[in-house]
Regions:
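Residues that define the transmembrane beta-barrel architecture of outer-membrane proteins
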Residues: 104, 138-144, 192-197, 274-278, ...
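Short loop/turn motifs that connect adjacent beta-strands in outer-membrane beta-barrel proteins
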Residues: 96-108, 120-121, 150, 154-158, ...
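N-terminal periplasmic/intermembrane-space "pro-region" immediately following the signal or transit peptide
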Residues: 43-137, 147, 151-153, 157, ...
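Outer membrane beta-barrel transmembrane domains
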Residues: 322, 338, 342-373, 394, ...
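Residue-level signature of outer-membrane beta-barrel architecture
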Residues: 114, 150-152, 162, 203-205, ...
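Outer-membrane beta-barrel "beta-signal"
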Residues: 197-210, 505-517
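Transmembrane beta-barrel strands of outer-membrane/channel proteins
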Residues: 112-118, 160-164, 232-236, 293-297, ...
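Surface-exposed coil loops of outer-membrane beta-barrel proteins
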Residues: 174-198, 208-320, 364-365, 455-465
Length: 517
């Protein structure tokens, strides 16, 4: 490990001169060293079968939306069920630091996710107030979550989660539509004081006697559910807990980090700046088909921390349909169709541009054009497909009308992504995972003109714009170290950051350390 650490230190110093002097990188080097050791010397628990896993073993088990995207392990990443009483599970099969009961009415767990990212100097013809900084930077983000749940009856569950999000993003999370770290809170003044993330009731209404087995987790206590059922959720949560899920690209703790990979960038879902909202969701599940509709509160202002409690005048309406079947090569796949409508106190890009051209202000100001009751709507196709050899293929295509301002998630009006995901069975590290994905983001012409005239969004604003699509490639490798400990290497390459051909490209490597308690 000493040699790995020295090698890693020398490599980073050569790639990023002066970085080691400016940044306390001991933690990062330790993570890198452990990952390298795990890759070079694959290890197995005593007694583990030395034969590689059968490549015909399915990678994904079809499950309902009974998981959480920020705490979840979706099917491909879900810890296996607890071993029978009196049986000691092999250490390679235990993916949490402490065991969790499969039968208790209580749920208590936690997680810690620490992300280190940096970039070197990159070319930029000019920079503005909201630009991604061309000078070298390094940052660390930290998210800690406590998950609590209780099963009141066989059909009623309650959840309470407390979270702390600290640290900062590169350039204070400005200058990129597809920002490099989903864990970053976009308002650095909020600090890391713990806050209530979720407070929610889940009610299950059986519609059939047949039952199906599902994974138990932080937002799903039952291990079996009626095959046909209604589910009603009410309270505080984040919309990606239940909408826009994807087995291969939705989890910033063990998978990708970019926030236009883990979610549809054009899905401007209702949320405050921390990503949470209050609302209600009604879901229907029937074997291979699911449908869900939700109504949630919108923030009072774009990227605001406070929600507008008047749901009659401001709200987000979301509808998603999904179907699971053996679509290709007799292997499981899922297709999801999503639509949304937001109603809020929004500004209009075309109106802001026209006011500027009429001499109102030195730059266009979208805030001055805000009017209550404006709409923004969009659609998405989301798919995942299991392939042979422990591979998975996934992608999203997102579209929003883009006339009114980006309000809650990020400044994207069109997005396309495609990626691959695999687990480490082939190299005898079945709990490791790796993936690569390409994303292209765009905005509508009026939005481009607004930024070109010097206007500021809540994320973007270079003072001028040479327009072009923002193109991102991200790759990662996550190594399972022991029980609930994971370490990851991540790299992202971004062309035309903030839709600006006059800036970039920029290369953003990163390290991630994750613990599941």
């Amino acid at each position: 490990m000493f040699y790995c650490a020295c090698w890693g230190s020398a490599l980073l110093e050569r790639l990023f001169p002066g970085l080691m002097r400016r940044f306390n990188f001991q933690i990062g080097l330790a993570i890198l060293a452990v990952v390298l050791v795990c890759l070079v010397f694959p290890c197995r628990a005593v007694g583990q079968d030395a034969e590689p896993a059968d490549s015909s073993t399915p990678l994904v088990a079809a499950t309902a939306h009974d998981t959480d995207t920020s705490a979840q392990q979706t099917s491909a990443d879900t810890p296996p069920a607890a071993a029978p009483a009196g049986t000691e599970p092999e250490s390679s099969d235990v993916l949490t630091l402490f065991p969790h009961s499969e039968t208790s009415r209580y749920w208590i767990s936690g997680q810690a996710n620490i992300v280190l990212q940096w970039h070197g100097r990159f070319p930029a013809a000019y920079s503005g107030t909201n630009s991604f900084k061309p000078a070298p930077e390094n940052t660390t983000s930290k998210v800690y979550t406590l998950y609590l749940g209780y099963e009141l009856t066989h059909t009623t569950e309650v959840y309470l989660d407390v979270e702390s999000a600290g640290g900062h993003g590169l350039s204070n999370a400005l200058g990129l539509a597809g920002f490099t770290n989903l864990d970053v809170v976009r308002n650095p003044t909020l600090g890391d004081v713990p806050y209530l993330a979720r407070l929610m009731v889940r009610q299950i209404v059986p519609l059939s006697k047949e039952r199906v087995t599902v994974e138990r987790g932080p937002l799903a206590l039952a291990t079996s559910l009626p095959a046909r059922r209604l589910e009603f959720r009410l309270g505080k949560f984040t919309i990606p807990d239940f909408f826009d899920a994807n087995t291969y690209g939705t989890d910033s703790h063990l998978q990708f980090l970019n926030w236009t990979v883990d979610n549809d960038g054009a899905y401007d879902y209702a949320a405050n700046t921390r990503g949470y909202t209050d609302g209600a969701i009604l879901e229907y599940d029937d074997h291979w088909f699911s449908a869900r509709f939700g109504v949630m509160l919108m923030p009072k202002v774009a990227n605001g921390i406070f929600l507008d409690a008047d749901i009659a005048r401001a709200r987000g309406e979301n509808l998603e349909l999904d179907a699971t079947g053996n679509w290709l090569l007799h292997r499981s796949g899922t297709v999801r169709l999503l639509s949304y409508v937001n109603i809020a106190d929004m500004g209009n890009y075309q109106e802001a541009n026209q006011n500027f051209l009429n001499g109102q202000g030195a730059i266009p100001n979208i805030i001055s054009t805000r009017r209550q009751g404006r709409h923004k709507y969009g659609f998405e196709l989301n798919f995942e497909q299991e392939l042979p050899a422990h591979l998975g293929f996934f992608g999203r295509v997102g579209w929003s009308d883009g006339r009114n301002e980006s309000f809650a998630y990020t400044e994207v009006d069109r997005t396309v992504q495609a990626g691959v995901f695999t687990k480490g069975d082939k190299w005898r590290r079945k709990n490791d995972r790796a993936g690569g994905v390409f994303v292209a983001n765009e905005i509508v012409a009026a939005h481009e003109q607004y930024l070109g005239y010097g206007g500021l969004g809540f994320l973007l604003g270079d003072g001028a714009l040479t327009p072009g699509p923002e193109k991102i490639f991200e790759g990662f490798y996550t190594a399972h170290l022991w029980r609930g400990f994971f370490a990851s290497c991540d790299f992202q390459h971004i062309n035309n950051p903030g839709y600006n051909k006059a800036r970039g490209p920029v290369f953003v490597p990163g390290l991630r350390f994750h613990v599941e308690f």
